[in-house]
A protein has these predicted regions:
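Histidine-centered catalytic micro-motifs used for acid/base chemistry in nuclease
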Residues: 45-57, 66-71
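Short Cys/His-centered divalent metal-binding micro-motifs
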Residues: 62-89
């Protein structure tokens, strides 16, 4: 579960969009437009807090390890990491 503090820290790191209110709209690392009020939604501007280095691999909740990421992208990223871990050499 992500705290409000973590959510706000991740949001503050996302790129500002010129001409748009930074408290309402930002861009993630992939250039997707996010809407603050769409947090936790799987919608066109929905987003989640992503741990850049997953906690399962030793990542922390530090601000440096958090980012706002479009929901679809974050869930795809998680699926890719699970697939890689199932196929890694250490699991053979």
């Amino acid at each position: 579960m992500v705290s409000n503090s973590q959510k706000d820290r991740a949001w503050s790191k996302a790129k500002r969009i010129p001409g748009k209110s930074p408290s309402k709209y930002r861009k993630d690392a992939y250039g997707n437009t996010l809407c603050y009020s769409s947090y936790g939604k799987n919608s066109p501007m929905g987003w989640e807090v992503d741990h850049i280095k997953p906690k399962s691999r030793g990542g922390s909740d530090s601000t440096m390890n958090l980012q706002a990421l479009k929901t679809r992208v974050n869930r795809s990223k998680g699926a890719d990491q699970r697939k890689r871990s199932r196929h890694s050499k250490s699991n053979r």
